[in-house]
UniProtKB/Swiss-Prot annotation:
NCBIfam families: RNasePH. Coiled coil: none annotated. It holds the Pfam family RNase_PH_C. This is Ribonuclease PH. HAMAP family: RNase_PH (MF_00564). The lineage of its organism: Bacteria, Pseudomonadati, Pseudomonadota, Betaproteobacteria, Rhodocyclales. Phosphorolytic 3'-5' exoribonuclease that plays an important role in tRNA 3'-end maturation. Removes nucleotide residues following the 3'-CCA terminus of tRNAs; can also add nucleotides to the ends of RNA molecules by using nucleoside diphosphates as substrates, but this may not be physiologically important. Probably plays a role in initiation of 16S rRNA degradation (leading to ribosome degradation) during starvation. It is an enzyme of class 2 (transferase). It catalyses: tRNA(n+1) + phosphate = tRNA(n) + a ribonucleoside 5'-diphosphate. InterPro entries: ExoRNase_PH_dom1, ExoRNase_PH_dom2, ExoRNase_PH_dom2_sf, PNPase/RNase_PH_dom_sf, Ribosomal_Su5_D2-typ_SF, RNase_PH, RNase_PH_bac-type, RNase_PH_CS.
């Protein structure tokens, strides 16, 4: 049995709370167990310079952690004057994942900026960010449809992400911090609602993993992401 008393293929309790803030066009508080991330989507009626005049839009993301999101306080990156490599990697991953399910030509010459701010971290912050950011982006784009600025929502599919890993020789789903810090293999998987793979990030922390174990982890992630997509659909079906 895992430290959280979950089965190997069991997600932590997941909650998606829409319209969590007042000002952003889309906002979601996403909770994966004790990991909590505030995701907002802000619409800008302009595009980056490299897209000007090309008739296409853009979706980008920024990611950060509150100083006391972790067990001990971390200095704000703004105070240090630069972002860490980890932060840059995660925000690029979030942006890539969302752009994979948006028809950027249909979006028109506008940009949506996703902000993912980790309020409390207990493992899986990047996967929670992607899963919550999808819902925030969906709401922001629906707002453009309601305002008559878009004929239809340009999102082409759902997208969600989950962590998997090998802990004490057993493939497990949705690692918390305790498992993540002591696992043999750590992997993050991003997939669409229709089963397309967007990204797989996998590392052997100690003993190399086999192709059979890799396949088992992907299968575990695919099933978990399927459940997350159902939760996204349920959240979006709410008033």
């Amino acid at each position: 049995m895992r430290p959280s008393q979950r089965q190997a293929n069991e997600l932590r309790p997941v909650r998606l709370t829409r319209r969590y803030t007042r000002h952003a066009e889309g906002s979601v508080l996403v909770e994966f167990g004790d990991t909590r991330v505030l995701c907002t989507a802000s619409v800008e009626e302009a595009v980056p310079p490299f897209l000007k005049g090309k008739g296409r839009g853009w979706v980008t993301a920024e990611y950060g952690m509150l100083p006391r999101a972790t067990h001990t306080r971390s200095a704000r990156e703004a105070a240090k004057g630069k972002q860490t490599g980890r932060t840059q990697e995660i925000q690029r991953l979030i942006g890539r994942s969302l752009r994979a399910v948006v028809d950027l030509a249909a979006l028109g010459e506008r940009q949506v900026v996703i902000d993912c701010d980790v309020l409390q971290a207990d493992g899986g912050t990047r996967t929670a960010s992607i899963t919550g950011a999808y819902v925030a982006l969906h709401d922001a784009l629906e707002g453009l449809v309601a305002a008559g600025k878009l004929a239809a929502n340009p999102m082409t599919d759902f997208v969600a992400a989950i962590s998997v890993g090998i802990v004490d020789g057993v493939p497990v789903l949705d690692l918390d911090y305790t498992e993540d810090s002591g696992c043999d293999t750590d992997m993050n998987v991003v997939m669409t609602g229709s089963g397309g793979i967007i990204e797989v990030q996998g590392t052997a922390e100690g003993t190399p993993f086999s192709r059979t174990e890799l396949n088992a982890l992907i299968d575990l992630a695919e099933a978990g992401i399927g459940r997350l997509v159902e939760l996204q659909k349920a959240a979006l079906a709410g008033a």
